[in-house]
Design a protein with these regions (language model features):
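Charged, low-complexity intrinsically disordered regions
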Residues: 1-250
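Conserved pre-motif I regulatory segment
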Residues: 250-284
């Protein structure tokens, strides 16, 4: 294809031939300037804040690419860019419309071990639910390592055996509540093993089914207690709902359907894949 008449056709050819929005190539095809093309394809393609082509000109992508992925992060970037350059207001407007619907607390599934929940909340839950004595709170702490993706409860064995919450209500004589909480945070089912000697005098570990069943009941009780606790405080609920929506409910799939698009007059040798049709389907509506 040497020439085309419209910006939409140029975009179709660029996507088919180059698999991207190549404004220089589209300019050659149409004889239009890059600025003219950008104007005619407004809301069909978007200039990406902070990204330039190798020749220093603005970098553009199709709407279905730009308005998908982590659209919350993209909106923040566009808002910052628009403060410096008002032409990015169109990005802000489009991304605002593309934001996922905020979920409320009743729609958010919370579980122990979800890494978006700050360890301070886990520690607060632990102290309140297990009635951790104040003098022990310095030595019993919740830690999370992003390097190993492991939760650890430091000082989990420092609680005394006559602690009812730790060894009876939420724990057993074989696994206290802090140990079971640590397993729960690491998404492990609690297991209790006995060490026995076999016929050859060698020690080996065998699962104690009775103690494991009892500990599993305590583990379920801790999980239920956490679900009940996490939303109970209004301020905590508001903070965590906002954090969840910002961090976890932040993406939008590429979903624009351009399968119905045909390009009259375009070179029949050029074929577009379905996602490429989708990318320019919007331009057919303009």
């Amino acid at each position: 294809v040497a020439t085309v008449d419209t910006a939409s056709e140029a975009l179709a050819v660029s996507i088919s031939e180059k698999a991207c929005v190549d404004m220089g190539y589209m300019s050659q095809l149409t004889g239009k300037t890059k600025e003219e093309l950008a104007g005619e394809l407004q809301s069909v393609i978007f200039r990406v804040p902070g990204q330039l082509e190798q020749d220093g000109t603005p970098h553009y992508v199709t709407a279905d690419e730009y308005l998908s992925g982590n659209v919350r992060r993209k909106l923040r970037q566009a808002q910052r860019a628009a403060q410096q350059d008002p032409s990015f207001a169109v990005n802000v407007e489009a991304l605002t419309a593309a934001q996922p619907k905020d979920l409320d607390a009743s729609e958010i599934e919370v579980r122990l071990g979800a890494t978006w929940i700050d360890k301070e909340y886990i520690q607060q839950f632990m102290y309140e639910t297990f009635n951790t004595p104040f003098y022990l709170q310095r030595s019993i702490e919740v830690n999370y390592s992003s390097f190993t993706a492991e939760w650890q409860i430091k000082g989990k064995t420092s609680v005394s055996y006559n602690d009812v919450a730790a060894y009876t209500t939420y724990g057993t004589s074989r696994a206290n509540a802090y140990k079971i909480l640590e397993d729960s945070l690491n998404l492990r089912d609690v297991r209790i093993y006995d060490t026995i000697e076999d016929a050859d005098g060698k020690e080996r570990r065998v699962l104690n089914a009775k103690e494991t069943t009892l500990a599993a009941q305590k583990q379920q009780a801790i999980r239920e207690a956490f679900k009940d606790w996490i939303w109970r405080d209004p301020e905590r609920r508001q903070t965590l709902v906002r954090q969840y929506n910002e961090e976890m409910n932040s993406t939008r799939p590429r979903e624009y359907d351009g399968s119905h698009i045909t390009f009259g007059g375009m070179n029949p040798a050029i074929t577009l894949r379905e996602h490429q049709k989708s990318a320019i389907a919007r331009s057919e509506e303009h």
